[in-house]
Amino acid sequence: MKGGKRIQSTRQNRINGEIRAHEVRLTGLDGEQIGVVSLKEALEKAEEAGADLVEISPNAEPPVCRIMDYGKFLYEKSKTLKEQKKKQKVIQVKEVKFRPGTDEGDYQVKLRNLIRFLEDGDKAKVTLRFRGREMAHQQIGMEMLNRIREDLDELASVESFPNKIEGRQMIMVLAPKKK
């Protein structure tokens, strides 16, 4: 029969009538090994149990099939995937901007923000921006970056520290220390 359309299944596992093997290695509802049986016999056992016959590993010889509730199997699988996704933490880079003339009060507020970011597990980018005549006093900027590094020594490790000024700013990247 030419030109016939085949419906392509989007499922990862073949179930019931989609299984093409003549013989299968069958596993029961509770995970007990039943052995190698014909496909017809396996389908009958699945029907008796009121469940589906699901092909677990199609590349094995003979293919391994399990009697199970396929809907429940998909639900459990999606649930575990969601749990794994929740556990993955996306590390963000948070930026805090300083100036060479940042006063003590502002410095403490910005330092508190840096501490909060690092405790949350995010990386912190410290940007020190120079304007106008401040460019002539780059050593003040280096002193400030060194002070920040010393104040956050027990919380963070320095990933990149500027040796010289880049354009009109110095950038230091801090990563939280592993506990």
UniProtKB/Swiss-Prot annotation:
Gene Ontology CC: one annotated term: cytosol
Single GO molecular function: ribosome binding
UniProt GO BP: ribosome disassembly
Keyword Protein biosynthesis found: yes
Pfam assignment, any one: IF3_N
Subcellular location: Cytoplasm
InterPro entries (alphabetical): T_IF-3_C_sf, T_IF-3_N_sf, Translation_initiation_fac3_CS, Translation_initiation_fac_3, Translation_initiation_fac_3_C, Translation_initiation_fac_3_N
Keywords: Cytoplasm, Initiation factor, Protein biosynthesis
NCBIfam families: infC
Oligomer and partners: Monomer.
Protein family according to the UniProt entry: Belongs to the IF-3 family.
Role noted for this protein: IF-3 binds to the 30S ribosomal subunit and shifts the equilibrium between 70S ribosomes and their 50S and 30S subunits in favor of the free subunits, thus enhancing the availability of 30S subunits on which protein synthesis initiation begins.
Protein name (Swiss-Prot/TrEMBL): Translation initiation factor IF-3
Lineage: Bacteria, Pseudomonadati, Pseudomonadota, Gammaproteobacteria, Enterobacterales
Gene name linked to the record: infC
